[in-house]
From Swiss-Prot:
Its cofactor is Zn(2+). InterPro entries: A_deaminase_dom (IPR001365), A_deaminase_N (IPR013659), ADGF (IPR006331), Ado/ade_deaminase (IPR006330), Metal_Hydrolase (IPR032466). The active site is at 392 (proton donor), 414 (proton acceptor). It is an enzyme of class 3 (hydrolase). The gene is ADA2. It comes from the Eukaryota. This is Adenosine deaminase 2.
């Protein structure tokens, strides 16, 4: 990862990679033997020095040998240590690492790792060869992305907001939570703060600039973050403002098509979205529920496979509620999830609770509801699986990780606090629970300031099944997975063998309906991976 601030200074990140070998730099050791016997001042010291060297060198030799053994032993449990890697992949990896090191050396001795993603995004896009390579990398699955912020919002503004009858709520009260909210009405609402967007556009001198302001209002770009609580309120507020667009029937399917296109172009073959329960609407006021959405998505996946000639492409849906909801609401949602799971078993896969963990109810608060759902699940062919957000917090006393594991969660969303729980890490490894790391999200939402210190690196070095996801990329002003992979490549010193294993991890922890679907996904990814290796060798061998 690198950064250049407005041509003032350059930044370099020094990458230490000990994966394919160990380089030991030993300082010259000078031993000065002082002879206290005045009668021996003129004695030839060569034999004395030779004797000292023979005494010390065996120690150094043994030390270096033990050191190399220790480092190699630790490397054996790190990500990628057992990943198959042939000679051609090694050739591509050498090229990849040379490019990475050259990019680092082209910048000054300042460190970018603590800089916010918003500041460096344009530099990454314009100046990094490594980023271009990662864009071409087949990434497997994106396992943690929220449906209503899964693809960039430019589609909502450039297409959705130009549809007839689009209104925006505008008031001079900056504290009004509804300010900037979009919605479609068949006629002018009684509340005069709702303004017809087409009329507003007719009155502005620069429509392109106006639309850019609308788009910026749906991201965290340029906002005064304030403290952690204020940041989360601004973050949540965007979901409220955009809801009237993403749930409007003429836009809903198009937005998901936009997601599919962005992910496929970025090398993603399998997507799993968290979809909060809520209805869709049309201009007549007719309501379309989550059953409609799941069925519509199954149809859209079929057309997408044909459009892109990708028989392996898949979408899975995880139903969810905000963790601020009461027990009754959560129970009803889980009952619906159980029904959806059995009506659409190849698409609807489970349930989660979302939202800031430090402000909403902990998982233990809903233990009676979980117990009832477990009992109810015996009446169905498919029980309800869980994919809990847990450990997305900076507080020491958060208990959600304990309950997520005890409730047999299939994966853990974020898991930032997991390295503080050695026993839980052992259980995650033993039970093969996938961990969904969302690095850019974690930085922007102030869980991690310096990407090099991201706790995911500890999990990765322990050999836990880490996967990489974008979380809410639309609000963070990007699409796909390449930016997250890029951030970690620079900050964690990842090589191609490790990137390969991250992609494999994502496939292994995907919700494939059966072995046939898994084989289809993995085999298609593997073909793309070796094409990617050829691309690196053919394109960058002479650099």
């Amino acid at each position: 990862m690198f950064l250049k601030f407005k041509n003032i200074f350059f930044i370099v990140l020094t990458l230490s990679i000990v994966f394919n070998g160990l380089i030991v730099n030993s300082k010259n050791i000078h031993i000065n033997n002082k002879n206290n016997n005045n009668n021996n001042n003129n004695k030839d010291l060569s034999s004395s020095e030779s004797g000292s060297s023979s005494d010390i060198n065996p120690y150094i030799s043994q030390y270096n040998s033990e050191r190399e053994t220790l480092v190699n032993q630790e490397n054996q449990i790190k990500l990628g240590s057992n990943t198959p890697f042939n000679s051609k992949e090694q050739q591509a990896n050498t090229i990849f690492l040379n490019i990475l090191q050259n990019e680092e050396l082209s910048f000054s001795n300042n460190d970018p790792s603590g800089v916010n993603f918003f500041i460096e995004k344009q530099i990454i896009e314009n100046e990094s060869t490594i980023f271009k390579i990662i864009q071409n990398m087949p990434k497997g699955s994106a396992l943690h992305v929220h449906q209503d912020s899964s693809a960039t919002y430019d589609y909502l503004i450039s297409v959705g907001s130009y549809l007839p009858n689009c209104y925006i709520y505008l008031t001079y009260d900056v504290n009004d939570a509804n300010n900037g909210t979009f919605h479609f009405y068949d006629s002018q609402p009684t509340d005069s703060n709702w303004k017809l967007l087409s009329t507003i556009r007719e009155g502005v001198s620069n429509v392109e600039s106006f639309d850019q302001q609308l788009l910026d209002s749906l991201t965290l770009i340029g906002q005064d973050y304030g403290d952690y609580v204020s940041l989360w309120r601004k973050f949540d507020g965007i979901f409220g403002r955009v809801n009237g667009l993403v749930t409007y029937l003429p836009i809903a399917t198009g937005y998901m098509e936009h997601l599919f296109q962005q992910m496929i172009q970025d090398g993603v073959q399998h997507i799993e979205v968290r979809k909060c329960f809520g209805d869709f609407y049309d201009l007549t006021g007719k309501i379309y529920d989550d059953y409609w959405f799941v069925q519509t998505m199954e149809e859209l996946v079929l057309t997408t496979r044909q459009k892109y000639n990708m028989s392996e492409f898949a979408l899975k849906i995880i139903g969810c509620n905000g963790r601020h909801n009461n027990q009754s609401v959560v129970y009803d949602a889980m009952v619906m999830s159980l029904d959806l799971r059995n009506k659409y078993p190849s698409t609807f896969v489970g349930y989660d609770l979302v939202g800031p963990e430090d402000e909403g109810y902990p998982l233990i608060y809903f233990i009676e509801q979980f117990a009832e759902i477990k009992k109810l699940g015996y009446q169905y062919q498919y029980p309800l699986d869980y994919y809990f957000h847990a450990g997305e917090t900076i507080l020491y006393n958060n208990t959600n990780l304990y309950d997520a594991i005890l409730l047999n969660t299939k994966r853990i969303g974020h898991g930032i606090q997991l390295p503080k729980h050695p026993l839980l890490m052992d259980l995650v490894l033993k039970n093969d629970i996938g961990i969904e790391i969302c690095p850019i999200s974690n930085q922007i939402l102030q869980y991690v300031s310096d990407m090099r210190a991201h706790p995911g690196l500890d999990l990765l070095n322990r050999g836990l099944p880490v996967t990489i996801s974008p979380d809410d990329p639309a609000i963070f002003n990007y699409g796909g997975l390449s930016y997250d992979f890029f951030e970690l490549t620079y900050s964690w010193g990842l090589n191609l063998q490790q990137l390969k294993q991250l992609a494999i991890n994502s496939i292994n922890h995907s919700n494939t309906f059966n072995q046939s679907e898994y084989n289809l996904l993995y085999n298609a990814w593997e073909v793309k991976w070796f094409n990617f290796i050829d691309y690196i060798i053919n394109t960058y061998s002479n650099i």
